[in-house]
């Protein structure tokens, strides 16, 4: 999942990096094929070039290796709100058929079963980035018919990729997600059964390329570097 998400990034793109799997995927892309990808963190790090996997958006390695550090106000007003982010890399606890995301709460907001980390900058990133990549594990608990809380609105222009451990989803012309590719060894019915709505299939279903040994080695080294 992380490797397939990393493959979505292109060299030279300005990428705003979320926490968790998006963080690993973006840094992996820089190691593999996009060394000139500009990593931006909402804490204010511009052009971060961390030598290890950052533990959070406040990791001191980001400050030490960034080309520039800006205030949170400048980050949200100039960089995100100003449309200067090519790709927003996000995670989600829940996602619906229109790629709306929930990172706030599971269950009623007033008395949730689980209180999630919250919005952070995700709503602004989802609304203002030129494209959005979402990483999530594929299960009926995550891919739901109705979100418990709408944190971030789906990217209605269609420039969205949802990368899961089973395949790749992208919006059709009407904005509804459809399965466009499955990973090696995965059958389309597996993906449909792991989705909380009647998932559409693209007319010509593709298969993602197998993961290479080089990609796996780089990912293992990146994960092993965390916290050093």
Where are these regions (language model features)?
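N-terminal active-site beta-alpha-beta segment that forms phosphate/nucleotide-binding
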Residues: 1-66
């Amino acid at each position: 999942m992380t490797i397939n998400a990393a493959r979505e990034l292109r060299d030279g793109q300005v990428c705003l990096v979320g926490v968790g799997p998006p963080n690993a995927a973006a840094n992996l892309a820089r190691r593999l094929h996009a060394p000139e990808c500009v990593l931006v963190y909402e804490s204010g790090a511009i052009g971060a070039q961390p030598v290890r996997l950052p533990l959070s958006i406040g990791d001191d390695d980001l400050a030490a290796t960034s080309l520039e550090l800006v205030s949170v106000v400048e980050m949200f007003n100039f960089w995100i709100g100003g449309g200067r982010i090519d790709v927003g890399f996000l995670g989600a606890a829940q996602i619906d058929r229109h790629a709306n995301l929930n990172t706030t709460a599971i269950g009623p907001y007033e008395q949730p079963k689980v209180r999630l980390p919250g919005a952070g900058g995700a709503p602004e990133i989802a609304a203002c980035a030129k494209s959005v990549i979402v990483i999530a594990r594929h299960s009926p608990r995550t891919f739901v018919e109705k979100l418990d809380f709408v944190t971030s609105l789906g990217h209605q222009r269609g420039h969205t990729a949802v990368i899961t451990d089973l395949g790749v989803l992208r919006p059709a012309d009407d904005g509804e997600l459809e399965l466009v590719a499955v990973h090696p060894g995965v059958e389309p019915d597996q993906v449909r059964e792991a989705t909380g709505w009647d998932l559409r299939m693209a007319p010509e279903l593709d298969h993602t390329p197998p993961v290479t040994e080089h990609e796996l080695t780089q990912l293992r080294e990146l994960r092993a570097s965390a916290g050093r």
